[in-house]
């Protein structure tokens, strides 16, 4: 570590420490967190009691992820071959700039773009990039929609607006929609639905992440509850899926294992929707001739982002962080996160966030404060 790096770490730590103290003293954040943590723990316990076998399936999935990372080059090539065989396009992007350049060739100025939740897109700072290109960008996940308009940052891997109580959401929606919106959660959800409907139907491009990608078929797995990802990936003419290399698993069955384990640990007995996407929309209804571009997207673009993941895989200890399913359960069990929300992190949060940050995002200067905040209590395990 150089002297300059030490100086950067000191400066980053000072800013970071101030953010933590401010979060702990913010009554609004503390109210939202206490409600969310209590609700999550209650629901997760119910889900695991109903499906006790999920703990063994998690062990099985760990072996799948370990195998996948050991064979990542081979599996990534297999995904690319399968996607392109089914008339999609696939890029294995070494760095964020490669992914952004590819996306810039797909979208056009003044395009209306709808997005579903994707942490990998956050690695790219994709919204800022698209807006600089002259595009109109709509986050459609309710939590992402809220923080987009608050100009905040995600405060949880799965629930990005976890730090915003319903009263503040009502104030925000009243401002956005030009009318009084009460702090009733059911009403707030309906107002967001109404507001976003127009964007869904006008959008030229839909951008999603992926919970898993099966190499044998090139199939993208998307888990959701709101139904927005189905509209994002089904209505626009172009669909772009952005995923880290670690989302690749060998088979369709492995992808379904990800769905089952991730959704249960995310505290859902069953997700509302699971989408499997393997190609642009197609039909063979006339003379059994397959034609691409039916009711859904005419184009499918899959971007597999490396961004130092292959370097991380070479480290026998740190590569385990890439087994993470992004269910977010560890954060609710953490002794620090319920006090500070996503200020305990740099996009990727909590103890595991220190490792992911060091390799995928800000390097040591951003990772060190997160690592030193961790109490090493082990509750996240």
Identify the meaning behind each predicted range:
Residues 2-317, 352:
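The feature marks the mature, well-folded catalytic cores of soluble enzymes
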Residues 324:
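Phosphate-binding glycine-rich loops and their immediate beta-loop-alpha structural context
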């Amino acid at each position: 570590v150089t002297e300059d790096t030490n100086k950067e770490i000191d400066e980053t730590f000072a800013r970071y420490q101030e953010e933590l103290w401010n979060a702990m003293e913010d009554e609004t954040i503390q109210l939202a967190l206490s409600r969310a943590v209590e609700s999550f723990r209650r629901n997760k316990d119910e889900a695991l009691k109903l499906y006790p076998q999920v703990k063994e399936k998690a062990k099985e999935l760990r072996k799948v992820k370990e195998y996948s990372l050991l064979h990542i080059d081979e599996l990534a090539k297999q995904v690319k071959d399968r996607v392109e065989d089914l008339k999609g396009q696939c890029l294995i992007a070494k760095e964020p700039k490669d992914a952004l350049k590819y996306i810039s060739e797909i979208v056009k100025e003044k395009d209306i773009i709808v997005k579903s939740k994707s942490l990998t897109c956050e690695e790219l700072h994709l919204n800022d990039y698209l807006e600089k290109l002259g595009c109109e960008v709509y986050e459609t996940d309710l939590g992402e929609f809220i923080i987009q308009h608050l100009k905040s940052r995600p405060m949880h891997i799965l629930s990005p607006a976890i730090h915003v109580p319903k009263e503040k959401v009502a104030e925000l929606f009243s401002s956005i929609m030009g009318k009084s919106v009460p702090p009733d959660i059911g009403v707030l959800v309906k107002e967001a639905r109404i507001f976003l409907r127009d964007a869904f139907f006008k959008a030229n491009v839909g951008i999603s992440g992926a919970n898993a990608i099966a190499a044998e078929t090139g199939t993208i797995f998307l888990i959701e509850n709101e139904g927005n990802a189905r509209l994002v990936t089904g209505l626009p003419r172009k669909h772009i899926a952005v995923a880290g290399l670690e989302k690749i698993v060998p088979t369709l069955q492995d992808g379904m294992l990800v769905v089952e384990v991730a959704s249960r640990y995310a505290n859902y007995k069953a997700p509302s929707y699971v989408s499997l996407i393997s190609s642009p929309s197609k039909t063979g209804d006339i003379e059994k001739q397959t034609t691409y571009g039916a009711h859904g997207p005419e184009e499918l673009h899959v971007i597999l982002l490396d961004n130092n993941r292959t370097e991380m895989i070479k480290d026998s200890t740190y590569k385990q962080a890439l087994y993470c399913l992004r269910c977010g359960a560890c954060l609710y069990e953490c002794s620090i996160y319920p006090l500070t929300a996503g200020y305990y992190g740099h996009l990727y949060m909590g103890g595991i966030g220190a490792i992911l940050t060091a390799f995928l995002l800000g390097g040591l200067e951003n990772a060190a404060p997160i690592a030193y905040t961790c109490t090493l209590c082990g509750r996240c395990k």
